[in-house]
Regions:
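Short beta-strand/turn micro-motifs composed of small residues
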Residues: 8-10, 35-37, 103
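A short acidic (Asp/Glu
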Residues: 18-19, 44-46, 111-116
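GT-A fold catalytic core of metal-dependent nucleotide-sugar glycosyltransferases
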Residues: 83-128
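Active-site-proximal specificity loops/subdomain of glycosyltransferases
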Residues: 38-95
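Conserved catalytic core of nucleotide-sugar-dependent glycosyltransferases
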Residues: 109-165
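A structural signal for isolated positions on well-ordered beta-strands in alpha/beta enzyme cores
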Residues: 5-7, 32-34, 50
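N-proximal low-complexity "stem/linker" segments adjacent to membrane-targeting elements
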Residues: 1-20
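Short, acidic, metal-binding catalytic loop of nucleotide-sugar glycosyltransferases
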Residues: 22-32
Length: 165
């Protein structure tokens, strides 16, 4: 299977159901998970879940270094608007992966390989359009796709500089 890393930022206390999420990650050993969180409690992380403890302010500052304009990222929920840019924003962590994606921590996964097949991974650059589970091919072109104009000049700039979601 192609190498996949799911990016999961979560700031605040992780929900009580998080252990179930971790169990479902463990049942998918071919997928890695990158958890960015300020919750430093010792939890039963499987080998394929890589927890990076950091503050929301530190993540915001890191994202800001990638742009020449000031970002509006005042609360963690706004990170949802940045999801299509994770390939660009976290390129060091995602180096070596064929695909990266994002998902919600309230998801319980079955065998992802049954649904996301090698054939799909070889044919598509993006799988899933909803925030609860999306995959993107890890290439420079796809990782910068969020900057492509869609009827207005630099729509990402408007989204990244307003507090609205």
């Amino acid at each position: 299977m192609k190498k996949i890393c799911m990016v999961v930022p979560y700031f605040g206390k992780l929900p009580q159901s998080f252990n179930f999420f971790l169990l479902s990650c463990a049942y998918n050993p071919d997928v890695d998970w990158l958890l960015l969180t300020d919750d430093d409690r010792p939890l039963p992380y499987p080998e394929n879940v890589h927890c990076v403890v950091m503050s929301f302010d530190a993540l915001r500052a890191r994202f800001q270094t990638k742009f020449s304009f000031p970002l509006s990222l005042e609360r963690p929920y706004k990170l949802r608007d940045y999801r299509p840019a994770y390939g660009f924003l976290l390129e060091e962590e995602l180096r070596g992966y064929d695909f990266w994606g994002c998902c919600d921590v309230d998801m319980m996964f079955g065998d992802i390989g049954v649904f996301i097949t090698e054939d799909m991974l070889s044919r598509y650059d993006q799988i899933g359009r909803m925030g609860h589970f999306s995959l993107y091919r890890n290439t420079p072109e796809i990782n910068l796709l969020f900057t492509a104009a869609a009827g207005e000049e630099e729509p990402y700039r408007r989204i990244f500089t307003t507090e609205e979601n």
